């Protein structure tokens, strides 16, 4: 089977292991930087290229970074249109990065979750915050990952200030109630 691993860098551990495993199992495998791919979109003949060479794979394994979701998903979609089977679909990649959609779906199931506010925040920031509850608030960028773009605000004024600042960069913002928890620590041997 001809497999394309779509990654930014062969040196990434996960990419390297996928490549090694595929080769060990006898597959014709290539790592391709999806950021260097470009597409030809024409009637009934989707094509994709990298460095002037047309690409074709039986299967692709996407390793798309969160910061490149839109472009990476477009590359995966082009391979899908060409008949390649993808380990993660382009739609799945896009949906997995959409925090708002995930929260809307989870909220509709009855699963316990923090009260979340989302709005354009063009005028009435305080009303959106009040719809969530009382401070403290957790303010999140929709596009942030792994804790980036997350701010805990202790007061209403601090929350308004953070949102006003984020609005200046046209960021999409979620506001959530803060749920405190007590961390359990096991007794130390000295306490026995």
Q: What are the functions of these language-model segments?
A:
Residues 3-20, 29, 49-55, 79-83, ...:
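Active-site nucleotide/adenylate-binding loops and adjacent lid/helix of ATP-dependent enzymes
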Residues 7, 17, 21-23, 32-45:
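N-terminal beta1-alpha1 cap of cysteine-dependent amidohydrolase-like domains
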Residues 22, 60, 186:
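A residue-level signal for conserved active-site and pocket-lining positions in enzyme catalytic cores
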Residues 35, 65, 142, 178-179, ...:
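Anionic group-transfer/hydrolysis microenvironments
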Residues 35-80, 91-96:
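N-terminal glycine-rich "phosphate-gripper" loop used for MgATP/nucleotide binding
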Residues 74, 182-183:
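Short, surface-exposed coil-to-beta transition loops
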Residues 184-192:
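Single conserved hydrophobic/aromatic residue that forms the stacking wall/gate
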